[in-house]
Amino acid sequence: MKENETLKQIVLKSLEEGVDSLIVSFPDVEKSSLRIKIEYSRDEKFGDYSTSFSLENSKLLKRNPIQVSKELVEILQKRTDLFEKVDFTPPGFVNFKISPSYLLEYIEKSILSGDHFPKVEHPLKINLEFVSANPTGPLNIVSARAAANGDTMASLLKAIGHNVDKEFYINDYGNQVFLLGVSTLVRIREIKGEFSTRQEADDTTPIDTILEKNILPAEGYRGEYIKDIANALLNEPKKSSQIETLLKEKKYRELAELCSIWTVENNLDWQRKDLDSFGVEFDNYFRERTLHESDKVLAVMKDLERVGKIFEEDGKKIFRSTEYGDDKDRVVVRDDGRPTYLLADIAYHKDKIERGYDRIYDIWGPDHHGYISRLSGAVQTLGYKKENFKVIISQQVNLLESGQKVKMSKRAGSFQTMSDLIGFLGKHGKDVGRYFFVMRSLDAPLDFDLDLAQDQSDKNPVFYLQYAHARICSIFREVGTESSAEAAESLEMSEERKRLLFWIARFPEEIFDSANSMEPHRVANYLQSFAKAFTGFYLGKNNRLKDATPEVRLGLARICLAARSVLAEGLGLIGVSAPEKMEKES
């Protein structure tokens, strides 16, 4: 057993060695042409792992899959140190049941050694950008999902040896930010007694007239939080004085620009506090404004022009994004000379490349899928390999209360924030929120059941895991933590004990595979199955430590120590606490 191998890799290696022996009698068959893989058994009664090797390669071997399976089983059965049992089931699946003694040995060298996770051979420097919400308001529920998953992805990648920088991109430049400032200014003037009106969607009134007449733009922000910000600004003496002066001088555009800056900073502070309460810390906050101020945005267009990827039409400069799968070529500089958001985004990713990242991963919202090909194309144009840039789409979140959807809308002011959700869920808001957001694959919409999230029984999947951890801690408070690997080796192995040992031993490979696939939900799914295996063990005959003989107690305690470690580490990677005591254990 090598230190850096998962149990699955060990079994696969044994299978490959078995295939080497098998194909000696097939001189015309090259091993490289064979499909050799293993997977978890779909039904635990057949074993721990299985392979469909015989079915997938029977044509190439020109032999019946059942006959191939029989020959392979005969070879692999000789590995009695690793396998308790190797057999096959028609039409040609070979099943592996791992020896309990091997499981115990593996657990000692991995789970109980303090170094739980195999490390990658070549660690990468990775930039992982997520959340990156516009600074136009507090973080919403979709951002909360991205925050929980992005932070967990970073933890998983770090666990297997990569160097990861978590980055938040601040869109603090452009028309939406200006409209945010205009919206705040409207509320300030309302507070000071001025009358305001709201622009209709089809109204084409010029912006200077809108500012002069104190009109809230159709695309402005109407949430109550804008009024709160306006009041806060007026309560700051220095800013209040600036506001008073500029209003008297009727310098509305200048004041709107100032309000944009102030409101953005207020919202960023709000967002950081929300993220902190959610246990999410970023290594870098990168401002879009710095790209424009340093002329990096227009500079990257020249890079694209040099390689022939820009053409002009009607005074616009257009990127040939259709060459990379986009449905049409995209404008990067408008006919008035202003760069589009796409060009700024290309400049931002060029900056990432120049910072020396081996991999660039972005998590985007549900309405950005069509944006991938054009940005990926630009990144390739800049000389970055396509496979080293990856975009993960975080799909929509539906909040459900009593089975009904709860509506969300930022501009209309009727939306639920991350802060609202954490507060709604009470003192367990962080743990419950983070776990619920990683329970499902990011590429699928998530129905967030508020009723289940508030349930503090073990029907709630978060509490189910935490109760399991607290239960083990309670056992150790009762009988002590003394344990023995030798005593564990001497235990009579019931099915419940063997099942739990296998689920413990799976932990490193589950983390390794989840990190490599960047799928945090796999950890959540694994932990649920693990806790189920522990519950079966806990309720099983002769597994109560307090009732066991001293020797059996030492062996069972060894298994429980490993189980506690898996739960604590697994929950920690998701950003969920593992309490030693719970008010209710049911």
Curated annotation (Swiss-Prot):
Subcellular location(s) of the protein: Cytoplasm
Record has Cytoplasm as a keyword: yes
Chemical reaction(s) catalysed: tRNA(Arg) + L-arginine + ATP = L-arginyl-tRNA(Arg) + AMP + diphosphate
GO biological process: arginyl-tRNA aminoacylation
Domain of life of the source: Bacteria
InterPro entries on file: Arg-tRNA-ligase, Arg-tRNA-synth_N, Arg-tRNA-synth_N_sf, ArgRS_core, DALR_anticod-bd, Rossmann-like_a/b/a_fold, tRNAsynth_Ia_anticodon-bd
Keywords: Aminoacyl-tRNA synthetase, ATP-binding, Cytoplasm, Ligase, Nucleotide-binding, Protein biosynthesis
CDD domains: ArgRS_core (cd00671)
GO cellular component terms given for this protein: cytoplasm
GO molecular function, one term: arginine-tRNA ligase activity
Chief location: cytoplasm
Short sequence motif named 'HIGH' region, residue ranges: 133-143
PANTHER family: ARGININE--TRNA LIGASE, CYTOPLASMIC, ARGINYL-TRNA SYNTHETASE
NCBIfam families: argS
Family classification: Belongs to the class-I aminoacyl-tRNA synthetase family.
Known partners and oligomeric status: Monomer.
Protein name: Arginine--tRNA ligase
Gene assigned in the entry: argS
